[in-house]
Regions:
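Acidic/histidine-rich catalytic neighborhood of metal-dependent amide-processing enzymes
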Residues: 1-49, 97, 183, 187, ...
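His/Asp/Glu-rich mid-to-C-terminal helical/loop segments that flank catalytic regions of hydrolases
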Residues: 7, 74-91, 119-124, 163-173, ...
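A conserved active-site cap/scaffold subdomain adjacent to cofactor or substrate pockets
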Residues: 74-77, 105-182
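Active-site-adjacent substrate-binding region
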Residues: 76, 83-99, 241, 249-292
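A structural supersecondary motif
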Residues: 91-104, 184-200
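A common structural junction motif
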Residues: 91-92, 129-140, 228-236
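A short beta-alpha structural unit
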Residues: 102-104, 115, 147-159, 195-199, ...
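Zn-dependent metallopeptidase/amidohydrolase metal-coordination segment
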Residues: 184, 191-204, 211, 262, ...
Length: 334
């Protein structure tokens, strides 16, 4: 619906979006996004018969929304597993057999599993446990419930050749993940980010899915370019799509000034002026309505988009009176 809007049908210069879920909040911005999917065909080699095959599982990370939770310092299972393997490979002969991490493209990955073959199991386990201990100490206050499991398994099939293994682990460790830039306009707002959501290594193919977000279109292009460059540098095929625009905050818009003043007069306290690092319809609508000033507000809604969704009836009356007062004060020619 929003994507197919014909902007020529509307003449107004102010857009009131009635979709914010806290009645004391005025939303003035959101993030757009773009998906980056990569693929690389690697050379396979036989698993050394005398080497031991280990299965490493990482579980129990908090995960979360890769926009709203990206600034909370939570662990990314794909990045942790890549680090574990990279550090092991610096001192121990390793063959990488498989890797499966993450789930949804817009979620911070909570779990990852890989299988490797090692020449010296005792030395490899010692190095793995050392890196695991370092990670645990680094994230002790943020990720207290995560755990690694290492077990010996029987494995058939082939492993990745050594040069491709080095290339892929280097790329996974180097590619940006997390906050890319904070907003200079809105306190504590993430302006741009990237999340390495999915990594699969299986039977000759290495694929990844990541999502870049930004409320500023030029910055979204910058961060998506950085991710693209990292994977193209290793020879991977990169496809980017699903692009949707962000809504850049304008702290000096006339409608914001008006609604802030009205809120103070009506409710004897200032509203919370915020922007979010996730997608809202205003980002898409704004693309079709250049020059339009936008703001979003609404009654208290909880558990939105779930079977438990509910609205606080008392806040609907507050919201309604605020809406009517706002409409009264908007000039006829706006």
């Amino acid at each position: 619906g929003a994507k197919e809007l014909d902007g020529t049908l509307l003449n107004g210069k102010i857009l009131l979006n009635l979709d914010t879920e806290d009645d004391d909040e005025l939303s003035i911005g959101c993030a757009g996004g773009i998906d980056t999917n990569t693929s690389y065909s690697y050379q396979e080699t036989s698993i050394h018969k005398e080497w031991e095959v280990l299965k490493i599982k990482l579980r129990g990370l908090l995960g979360g929304h890769s926009g709203m939770d990206i600034n909370k310092g939570r662990g990314n299972a794909n990045k942790w597993m890549a680090r574990l393997l990279w550090e092991l490979k610096q001192s121990n002969p390793v063959q990488l057999i498989s890797f499966d991490g993450g789930s949804l493209r817009n979620a911070i990955p909570r779990e990852a599993t890989c299988r490797i073959a090692v020449a010296n199991s005792e030395e490899a386990r010692e190095k793995l446990l050392q890196t695991i201990a370092n990670i645990k100490q680094e994230y002790i206050r943020i990720e207290p419930d995560h755990f690694f499991e290492i077990e010996s398994v029987v494995s058939s099939g082939d492993a990745m050749n050594d040069s491709d293994c080095t290339k892929i682990l280097n790329t996974l460790c180097a590619v940006h993940n997390g906050v890319f830039r904070m907003s200079p306009q809105i306190k504590d707002l993430v302006e741009a980010s990237s999340s390495l959501a999915r990594v699969i290594i299986h039977e000759g193919t290495f694929t990844t899915q990541s999502l870049q977000r930004s409320s500023v279109e030029s910055t979204k292009s910058e961060v998506s370019m950085a991710i693209r460059s990292a994977f193209e540098n290793m020879g991977a095929t990169v496809e980017q799509g699903g692009d949707y625009p962000g809504w850049e905050p304008n702290r000096n818009s006339r409608i914001l000034t008006l609604m802030e003043d009205l809120y103070k007069k009506l409710f004897n306290e200032p509203p919370h002026v915020k922007a979010c690092h996730a997608g809202l319809e205003c980002g898409i609508l704004g693309k079709h309505l250049p020059g339009v000033e936008m703001i979003s507000f609404g009654p208290n809604i909880r558990a939105a988009h779930s079977p438990d969704e509910k609205v606080q009836i008392s806040s609907v009356q507050k919201f309604w009176s605020y809406l009517l007062e706002t409409l009264k004060h908007i000039p006829q020619n706006a």
